[in-house]
């Protein structure tokens, strides 16, 4: 399997050095919201490699470690002497202080949650135009009691004497708190002050830039050869296909594989909506029996993902041969809608542990015969939607709630069978109908409906005892799928969904609500 689409070089890139922070991806998103491009690199990356990427600025994230712990992440002092503007947050702030000769105390001066910050120099680079007293979000045990030489202390709390410092001459800045979270009321403003004033960057990274850069990168990669793109019915594959079509036009053929794992009515919707919006050449392959046969007897979620990924590629290879027989030239490239969170969750890009194999990243066989084109690989979901709108795709496609490539296959906890798929389709359709009727489509990120196929519970319907399956509702709110909270849906909507499912769907006698945030749980059950 060949490498993905080469990322076009951004003129100004902010590198977020990840020290194991819960919010590292959120920091990268906040930088992009300020219209400056950002990427994440692991703290294990040597300083010379970080600097070799020619960053316009560097942000040091928070992290769970103490600077005093044996084996805690460190940074070579040369990073701070390279002339690149650096902004330390939480652990990154403490690491900067300690490395440059300041004092960090392991004194038990803990602050967790909302804290009042007193700004001691309102005209400073970071805090100009913000209130002298402001709420910030803290999460630390150690505390900085003395700033390094040459730094000006610009903020403190009742517990921490040095909660922010700045060195304009060396362009080094730091805060003890988390400006990236919404609980820090002026956090985005402080971050933008670092980017625009401290680092001298301009807010010129836009969806138009993304389209222009990716179109050029795709043309350079594909040349005059041909590509196919698998349409799943989702936002990601649709936007990826639209981008590639803009780049290479009729050299692209889209293939929709009906693997039998889609929700009710979705196959017809894909054929109608996407073709109408783009005019792209679309080939539909009915492979439902093949997928069900391959999944027979399989309950392990990782194995299911691998099988679905493998069969998907095999179907694509067959489609390639058919397209070649019909149109001639060889198809050399496969377009995928891989996003940045997919890469991160699969352990790529940040040195993190593999949470689960993503169907767009780790679920592909090693002997794949295509070279991958992944034009969305560095984007978050909200950015993908903006690119889709810029490309002129309709809201029916761009605003569609996320749905995994493996489809209902990973929303059945247990073996996947036709009967179980039919049952889950009906339950899912009811939930979607009621959420739409209540006007909640845009208020939630997505609402997976899950069948616990290997679980049964006792119930009573009419005068008889039942022994049916439970259905799980998993409504979540999120900005980018990296973190999520369960959505507080109105009780009357939940009641209507539950009543309809238990009355209208055979062999289901219980509906339960998943109230787990991410972390610790992932959005999908499998």
Curated annotation (Swiss-Prot):
Keyword ATP-binding: yes
Domain of life of the native organism: Bacteria
Function: Catalyzes the synthesis of GMP from XMP.
Protein name (record): GMP synthase [glutamine-hydrolyzing]
Any one GO molecular-function label of the UniProt entry: ATP binding
Location of the active site: 90 (nucleophile), 178, 180
Organism lineage: Bacteria, Bacillati, Actinomycetota, Actinomycetes, Kitasatosporales
SUPFAM superfamilies documented for this protein: Adenine nucleotide alpha hydrolases-like (SSF52402), Class I glutamine amidotransferase-like (SSF52317), GMP synthetase C-terminal dimerisation domain (SSF54810)
GMPS ATP-PPase domain sequence ranges: 205-400
Gene: guaA
Stored NCBIfam families: guaA_Cterm, guaA_Nterm, PRK00074.1
One protein family per Pfam: NAD_synthase
Catalytic activity: XMP + L-glutamine + ATP + H2O = GMP + L-glutamate + AMP + diphosphate + 2 H(+)
Location of the Glutamine amidotransferase type-1 domain: 13-204
Gene Ontology terms: biological process: GMP biosynthetic process
Broad class of enzyme this protein falls into: ligase
Subunit structure: Homodimer.
Assigned GO CC terms: cytosol
Pathway: Purine metabolism; GMP biosynthesis; GMP from XMP (L-Gln route): step 1/1
Source organism of the structure: Streptomyces coelicolor (strain ATCC BAA-471 / A3(2) / M145)
